[in-house]
Amino acid sequence: PCFCGKTVGIYWFALYSCPGGYGYTGHCGHFMGVCCYPANP
């Protein structure tokens, strides 16, 4: 998992935005990818 502050999310490698269809409500940038949350949408 990854963290956006204290929020746990799912790390997506080599993406700069969250993939659709998972119900993500937000994200933050991480090294070589993006962290999308919530972790269990």
UniProtKB/Swiss-Prot annotation:
Any one GO cellular component localisation term in the record: extracellular region
The keyword Transport is annotated on this UniProt entry: no
Protein keywords: Cleavage on pair of basic residues, Disulfide bond, Ion channel impairing toxin, Nematocyst, Neurotoxin, Potassium channel impairing toxin, Secreted, Toxin, Voltage-gated potassium channel impairing toxin
Pfam families cross-referenced by the UniProt entry: Defensin_4 (PF07936)
GO MF assignments: ion channel inhibitor activity; potassium channel regulator activity; toxin activity
Main localization category: secreted
Protein name, as recorded: U-AITX-Bg1a
